[in-house]
Amino acid sequence: SEALPVKNNEPLIISIKKDGAIFLETESTKDRSLSLEEMKNFVSKIFEASPGLQVVIRGDGEVKYERVMTVMAELQIAGASDIGLISQPISSQ
């Protein structure tokens, strides 16, 4: 299985869009939405190659809290222990 490239010392970024779609920001996955299971499998492979890597969840300001918590739980199952959050502002519409 190929290791997914993550630049040295840079966190792995997981984006959660307003509709709950999950994107893993690596070269091979950044342009397609992933299921929770796909995300967990990709992240597990990344952690095999880079244990201890920081993960940052970039969530849309309007994404449901429950969705963020579900993604965090799956990341922990995949081996992530250092998980941070970045929120994107809620649109002014």
What are the roles of these predicted feature ranges?
Residues 6, 33-37, 65-67:
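Solvent-exposed, non-transmembrane alpha-helical starts
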Residues 34-49:
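Periplasmic peptidoglycan-binding/anchoring modules of Gram-negative envelope and division proteins
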